Amino acid sequence: MGFRLKVEGQETIELGLDNIQTVIYDTDTPDDSNARSTDVGSTLRISGKIITAVDGDSADDTLKLALWSLVPAEKADSYRKVTLEVIAADQVVRKVHFPNAFVVDYNEHFGDTEGVGAFTLYIKQKKDKTELATIDGGYPV
């Protein structure tokens, strides 16, 4: 199974099968509700490897993710269009699309023995635009 992430804004950020290791999609509603809540949110938590550029290869786009996480809320570019594809056996199992996503948390981890770093990106769809988020899948790549 593999993953492809595309973030579109003033610049395009793309991470692929080599970078992304785990993805968690979550529909978030209040836990203390006794009926279906209108307070619904959608989130993605994406984790993977930071790949170092070697032998003239270009660096991966994790640096661009880190820079996106620093964009202040006052700027329109803090919200971007995000598409995540989950791929298995040449099938798109899931395609999650957030047209107005923003970064909640971004972390990078480095150690002196691992050889590469790791990242975790936690994004949400803007709550007043949750109905614009889409999930589909079950078709060839």
Predicted feature residues:
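Glycine-rich, low-complexity intrinsically disordered segments
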Residues: 1-141
